[in-house]
């Protein structure tokens, strides 16, 4: 009779261990899904940036911009929500964020 109780105790421990493992697996799955979503977003942004770069390379701008006016290409990239400063170049700006390094580069 004591052996049956031991089996039940062991089954209870196994059940607890499996529940803990299942919780850990669910957490790992959520982290993986978030990483995959972020990866897909970053790949799309990278593709758009590469397309833009290809457009700029095709167009050979022969006009020189005056020194007192910022580079219109950098302004356009900045207005589309990307950093143009050397510290965070091509990283997406957060909603409503304004980077002092970018602004200094554009308007010095």
UniProtKB/Swiss-Prot annotation:
- What domain of life is recorded for the organism? Bacteria
**Major subcellular location class:** cytoplasm
Q: How is the cofactor bound?
A: Binds 1 zinc ion per subunit.
Q: Give the residues the record marks as binding Zn(2+).
A: 83, 85, 99, 102
Q: Which UniProt keywords apply?
A: Cytoplasm, DNA replication, DNA replication inhibitor, Metal-binding, Zinc
This protein's GO cellular component annotations are: nucleoid
Q: Where is it localised?
A: Cytoplasm, Nucleoid
The keyword Isomerase is annotated on this UniProt entry: no
What does the record list as GO biological process? DNA replication
* Cytoplasm found in the keyword field: yes
Task: Identify which cofactors the protein needs according to its UniProt entry.
Answer: Zn(2+)
* Annotated family: Belongs to the YabA family.
Could you give the subunit structure recorded for this chain? Homotetramer. Interacts with both DnaA and DnaN, acting as a bridge between these two proteins.
Q: What does this protein do?
A: Involved in control of chromosome replication initiation. Inhibits the cooperative binding of DnaA to the oriC region, thus negatively regulating initiation of chromosome replication. Inhibits the ability of DnaA-ATP to form a helix on DNA; does not disassemble preformed DnaA-DNA helices. Decreases the residence time of DnaA on the chromosome at its binding sites (oriC, replication forks and promoter-binding sites). Tethers DnaA to the replication machinery via the DNA polymerase beta sliding clamp subunit (dnaN).
- Give the protein name, as stated in the record: Replication initiation control protein YabA
**Protein's organism:** Lactococcus lactis subsp. cremoris (strain SK11)
